[in-house]
Amino acid sequence: ADTKEVLEAREAYFKSLGKSMKAMTGVAKSFDAEAAKAEAAALEKILATDVAPLFPAGTSSTDLPGQTEAKAAIWTNMADFGAKGKAMNDAGAEVIAAANAGDATAFGAALQKLGGTCKACHDDYREED
């Protein structure tokens, strides 16, 4: 894949994740078990994506100014970046489990935890808009 395709795929992945978070936040406000299960299934598909190919060397905001918000720190701290990604996937698994159990309280708590993992990564590895 060329650089443009990689950047488009990376952006599409994170946009789909953001859209999923927004939808689940809506579901959590007035918990609907069936809607939660449907959103959890969508989240599960998103989180099954192998994101490693979306972060090839040479695709940071330093390399491609104005084309991406991915900081160069990702590539100099790949182990930490990977750990943050794993934390997101683990929190996502908690959201999915709570949704499938129909547990509104656990769903809300897991969703907050998932949002926290997004913020933790953005704080270190995403350029400010």
UniProtKB/Swiss-Prot annotation:
What GO CC terms are in its UniProt record? periplasmic space
Q: Which Gene3D superfamilies match?
A: Cytochrome c/b562 (1.20.120.10)
Q: What does changing D90E do? A: In strain: M110
Question: Keyword Heme, does the record have it?
Answer: yes
- What top-level branch of life does the organism fall under? Bacteria
Effect of mutating T76A? In strain: M110 and St Louis
What, per the annotation, is the impact of changing K19G? In strain: M110 and St Louis
Q: What is the effect of changing A38V?
A: In strain: M110 and St Louis
Give residues annotated as binding heme c. Answer: R10, K15, T68, E69, C118, C121, H122
Q: GO MF terms on file?
A: electron transfer activity; heme binding; iron ion binding
- The molecule here is called Cytochrome c'
Q: Which InterPro entries match?
A: Cyt_c/b562, Cyt_c_II, Cyt_c_prime, Cyt_c_prime_subgr
Q: Which GO annotations describe the biological process of this protein?
A: electron transport chain
What function does the entry list? Cytochrome c' is the most widely occurring bacterial c-type cytochrome. Cytochromes c' are high-spin proteins and the heme has no sixth ligand. Their exact function is not known.
Keyword flag Metal-binding? yes
Tell me the keywords, alphabetical order: Electron transport, Heme, Iron, Metal-binding, Transport
Task: Cite the post-translational modification comment.
Answer: Binds 1 heme c group covalently per subunit.
